[in-house]
C-alpha cells in the first residue's frame, strides 16, 4: 500500500512537453526511475527518455508548467505528490505499479 503524506519534498524530475493542435501533454517522472521497468501482474511500466525526455527540472518548474497543459502523466512519488499537493490529482486515483505511483490528468 502506498502512503502519501504532507507536503512533498520534491527533488529533480524529468519533464517533456508535447503539443498536438490545442492539446498540450506534459510527461513528468522522478529522475531516479529513468531507464527502469516495473511490472505488477498484467500492468507494465517502462520509464524511458523517449517519452519523459532528458531535461531535468525542479518541482517549481513542474508547478509552473501545469497550468498550461491539458493532459499530464506523472510517474514516481515526487511527481505524483507534487500533482496532489497542487490539486491536479486526487490520492484516490493513483495507480501503483510495483510500488511506483502513477497518475494521469486530463483537463476537460
Label the predicted regions:
Residues 2-63, 67, 107:
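Conserved mixed alpha/beta catalytic, RNA-binding, or beta-rich assembly cores of soluble enzyme
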